UniProtKB/Swiss-Prot annotation:
Pfam families (UniProt xref): Cytochrom_B_C, Cytochrome_B
Binding-site residues, heme b b562: 83, 182
Main subcellular location: mitochondrion
Record-given protein name: Cytochrome b
Natural source organism: Xerospermophilus spilosoma (Spotted ground squirrel)
Cofactor: heme b
PROSITE patterns: CYTB_CTER (PS51003), CYTB_NTER (PS51002)
InterPro entries per the UniProt record, alphabetical: Cyt_b/b6_C, Cyt_b/b6_C_sf, Cyt_b/b6_N, Cytb/b6-like_sf, Cytochrome_b, Cytochrome_b_C_euk/bac, Cytochrome_b_N_euk/bac, Di-haem_cyt_TM
Residues noted as binding a ubiquinone in the record, renumbered to the chain: 201
Biological classification of the source: Eukaryota, Metazoa, Chordata, Craniata, Vertebrata
Chain positions recorded as heme b b566 binding sites: 97, 196
Cellular component terms (Gene Ontology): mitochondrial inner membrane; respiratory chain complex III
């Protein structure tokens, strides 16, 4: 008699995805971040659901409802901080997951890769709208500044911004619709994750060497289920350490002041995970140019399969490309730092140089270095 898990219409899908899935025998801990992102999404949906039970999306009561959650709801403070810091963990895992894909050439599975980039955009949109909901000073002014960027779109810009606002400024209508979108988007993300996995399982996983691993596969369970559980335990430990010892470390003190349209905070800045993109936006003096640079700083990821000129897939055996990759990582850290600094000398020029370097490395230096390495192989 055949096993139920191999014959049952529903269970066999799970079986082919997480149990009897043939996986390369040499994938490292860098391949753990997919499952960690799944965990982060589950944590965010669950904690978000419980927060939504007590939250009110009205400008008069939103700030008070968050205070009420933290003070009066059983373990409300814990749920709120898991949700806020869970977002930071989500982005740490996202950046490492994308970085892994760039380093090991996983972008050559271009359907999987492009859906991943769409997922990144969706998560960024969700996080931005979530940041507006507590209706603190940085929530209000962040929403005002970022939505205002759309007014740079020629001809329809101003109309588009007022349409998104639902009025002539960020107000009750804006908050209500942001709450609605913030609630629905994670479920759309979950659906996209399924498609992401569907395309991944069409080809199978990449591996550190970048070589075809069909001749050397092992079952996902128990080998990688155990490995994933270890990663999950480490993630939960890191998250709970952050929440219980320093829950406001990554937040902005300005957001503990209720939103006031009449007083602008001295430095308007987004959460830390958007600072690199914010620095690129600010480094261009022209409004439309800045918005385009902001969008292309993420959209450029879709060009990686086209810009790959090396004869090898992975960077594992390409020391020159490795060097450029780590310079790119350092550049992103620099941009993140600059994004949190005031707009004054010397930060302006550092931000502009870091932004130029970011696009130059990706569009020019990495492909050129790849061609040099191809020549070195012959030599």
């Amino acid at each position: 008699m055949t096993n139920t898990r191999k014959t049952h219409p529903l269970i066999k899908i799970i079986n082919h995805s997480f149990i009897d899935l043939p996986a390369p025998s040499n994938i490292s801990a860098w391949w753990n971040f997919g499952s960690l992102l799944g965990l982060c999404l589950a944590i965010q949906i669950l904690t978000g659901l419980f927060l939504a039970m007590h939250y009110t999306s009205d400008t008069m009561t939103a700030f008070s409802s968050v205070t009420h959650i933290c003070r009066d709801v059983n373990y409300g403070w814990l749920i709120r901080y898991i949700h806020a810091n869970g977002a930071s963990m989500f982005f740490i895992c996202l950046f490492l997951h994308v970085g892994r894909g760039l380093y090991y050439g996983s972008y050559s599975y271009f359907e999987t890769w492009n859906i991943g980039v769409i997922l990144l955009f969706a998560v960024m949109a969700t996080a931005f709208m979530g940041y507006v909901l507590p209706w603190g000073q940085m929530s209000f002014w962040g929403a005002t500044v970022i939505t205002n960027l759309l007014s740079a779109i020629p001809y329809i810009g101003t109309t588009l911004v007022e349409w998104i606002w639902g009025g002539f400024s960020v107000d009750k209508a804006t908050l209500t619709r942001f709450f609605a979108f913030h609630f629905i988007l994670p479920f759309i993300i979950a659906a996209l994750v399924m498609v992401h996995l569907l395309f991944l399982h069409e080809t199978g996983s990449n591996n550190p060497s970048g070589l075809v691993s069909d001749s050397d596969k092992i079952p996902f369970h128990p080998y990688y289920t155990i490995k994933d559980i270890l990663g999950i335990l480490l993630l939960i430990m890191a998250l709970m350490t952050l929440i219980l010892f320093s829950p406001d470390l990554l937040g902005d003190p300005d957001n503990y002041t209720p939103a006031n349209p009449l007083s602008t905070p001295p430095h308007i800045k987004p959460e830390w995970y958007f600072l690199f993109a914010y620095a690129i936006l600010r480094s261009i003096p022209n409004k439309l140019g800045g918005v385009l640079a902001l969008v292309f700083s993420i959209l450029i990821l879709m060009l990686f399969p086209l810009l790959h000129l090396s004869k090898q897939r992975s960077m594992m055996f390409r020391p020159l490309s490795q060097c450029m990759f780590w310079i790119l990582v350092a550049d992103l850290f620099t941009l993140t730092w600059i994004g949190g600094q005031p707009v004054e000398y010397p930060f302006i020029i550092i931000g502009q140089l870091a932004s130029i370097l970011y696009f130059t490395i990706i569009l020019l230096i990495l492909p050129t270095v790849s061609l040099i390495e191809n020549k070195l192989l012959k030599w």
